[in-house]
């Protein structure tokens, strides 16, 4: 067993104080907003489709989907304890403790969602992961995969804060690997600034001004920056299977 496998086997025990939150209501609100502001515009055509979440954790995303009327929901995760919580949260009996590679080989979906999982997969398995996602989608199906953004100002933290992180992506490299199989590929910022309150609108405005100032400073230094998404902590690829 590799060091990564040992940590993943005891992931919640070893990293629980870093990744868990006691405020379940706040955590659910975060996923409700993430879905509403970042995902919904891409997935609204799949409300009647068969949907899989890879790495469904404690069911926050699935619960958010239920709140918007999505019903044909499936989830997989390696943590049995998290799945137990997810089942209680969502009432779904379609959640399984299963490896993504195994599940994708034998099932078909219209929409596949995956947040903060791909970076944990070994680099020499990354292409296989994308290929299995492609093969598992029905014609017209879509995959949305979210990962940490290596162009972010604090990207070193995202890359190395977790020993089990195997690879990091920028918007260019994320598009590269998905275009090996998908013809329709776009990469978007997965911003965590949700404009749903006066306070957050003010923060968003201040953030916009700060980003412009940083870009200007980098131009003065001769470093460009017009093509670097340094202000976004995460990015998401939206890939559609047209044929």
What are these regions (language model features)?
Residues 1-107, 111-115, 124-130, 189-192, ...:
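Conserved N-terminal segment of class I S-adenosyl-L-methionine
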Residues 115-117, 147-148:
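Short loop/turn segments at strand-loop or loop-helix junctions that form parts
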Residues 72, 140-141:
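Short acidic capping loops at alpha-helix termini that bridge into adjacent secondary structure
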Residues 102, 119, 152:
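Active-site micro-motifs of SAM-dependent methyltransferase domains
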């Amino acid at each position: 067993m590799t060091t990564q496998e040992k940590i993943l086997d005891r992931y919640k025990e070893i990293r629980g104080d870093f990744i868990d939150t006691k405020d379940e209501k706040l955590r659910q609100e975060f996923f409700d907003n993430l879905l509403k502001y970042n995902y919904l515009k891409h997935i609204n055509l799949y409300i009647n489709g068969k949907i899989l979440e890879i790495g469904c954790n404690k069911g926050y995303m699935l619960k958010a989907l239920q709140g918007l009327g999505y019903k044909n929901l499936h989830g997989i995760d390696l943590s049995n304890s998290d799945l137990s919580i997810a089942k209680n949260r969502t009432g779904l009996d379609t959640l399984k403790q299963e490896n993504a590679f195994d599940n994708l080989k034998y099932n078909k979906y219209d929409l596949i969602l995956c947040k903060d999982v791909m970076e944990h997969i070994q680099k020499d398995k990354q292409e296989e992961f994308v290929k299995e996602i492609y093969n598992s989608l029905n014609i017209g199906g879509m995959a949305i995969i979210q990962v940490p953004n290596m162009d972010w100002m604090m990207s070193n933290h995202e890359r190395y804060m977790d020993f089990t992180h195997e690879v990091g992506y920028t918007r260019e490299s994320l598009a590269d690997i998905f275009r090996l199989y998908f013809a329709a590929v776009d990469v978007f910022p997965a911003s965590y600034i949700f404009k749903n309150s006066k306070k957050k609108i003010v923060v968003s405005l201040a953030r916009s001004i700060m980003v412009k100032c940083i870009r200007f400073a980098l131009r003065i230094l001769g470093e460009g920056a017009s093509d670097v998404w340094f202000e976004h902590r995460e990015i998401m690829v939206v890939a559609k299977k047209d044929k």
